[in-house]
Amino acid sequence: MKTTISSKGIRHSLGIPGTGWSYQTPLKKWNDNNQAPNIGNNSQEQKNTTENDYQKLEFSFLKKLICPKEEMALAQGIQACLLQDYSEAELYLNQALCYVDGAFTLGVIYLNEGRYTEAEMQLAKAEQTPESIGEFYRKYDLGMKMHIEITPYYAVDYEANAMASYIAHVKAFQQLNRHADACRLLLALYKAMPQNLDVMIFLAEIVLEKEPGNQQWMNAIINMTNNLQNDSYAHAVLLLSKAEAFDNIGMTEVAITTLTSVLSKKKDRPLDFLLEAQYQRGVLFLKIGKKTQAKKDLNAVFAINPGYANVNQLLGQL
């Protein structure tokens, strides 16, 4: 069970949650007797996870006397996030910007609220001392994690640390259409961590969206994923991007072979991801005139989701 920080709120999740700060049922305020609140239909484990984080930031009277006011503001800001009171969280966190985690947490909140310019500024501030990002979270052993959607089919969890800030920063750049800045940061991360699949997936996602006709970038994606096998879901997502890069440089049959590799393993793969891979393969079969194979793939997609993309229209052409 994880409590995640993502650009939709703080929430509990057994699997990969959504993007942002999310929390499916807001944590209610503690009553005057300091008893745990009733937070609706969440499981006991979920309630315990969130309440534990909240309680860890409920400082004793003595702690409040000796605690720096900025640290107290940071604690109260994170508590406000747990309550989904982001306006109050912002007020507190703006009093705690001398702490790197004040800027980091505020940056994530701004990302959640679609205030991308402000998010980028706060994350850049936090990254001036990257080794300090997450110190407050570690000090109080908080279970919250950074969560970002990289593609429609793939999201990542990170503890509060420099990597979490960098990935959030890339997301802010992406939303601001500052794709050159996003790629520059991702390339720096790739140079430092050439085996990091999350970085490669994010880089491929942005490049394929904005530079599909750039052969140099397409070759870079292909070379970056050289010898990649379908060993995990992350590998499969990256192979989906690789197939698109192959098709963009005219190597459609190689793209089809790559998609066949993606579809060779279905266990622990989300249905929407598998549908997209099969749909793309069907489209490519149609592109090279292999109508029988195209019809088979597109019919398989239609059987599960008749409204998927333009699958109905494509089948009407066969």
In which residue ranges do the predicted regions lie?
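Boundary/linker segments of alpha-helical solenoid repeat arrays
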Residues: 101-105, 130-141, 194-200, 215-216, ...
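Alpha-helical repeat scaffolds
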Residues: 88-94, 118-128, 180-189, 214-228, ...
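Alpha-helical segment of the N-proximal tetratricopeptide repeat
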Residues: 49-96, 164-176, 181, 254
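Generic helix N-cap/helix-start motif at coil->alpha-helix transitions
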Residues: 65-73, 97-103, 158-166, 193-202, ...
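Structural motif corresponding to the intra-repeat A-B loop/turn of tetratricopeptide repeats
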Residues: 83, 113, 176, 210-212, ...
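Solenoid-like repeat scaffolds
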Residues: 93-99, 127-130, 154-158, 187-195, ...
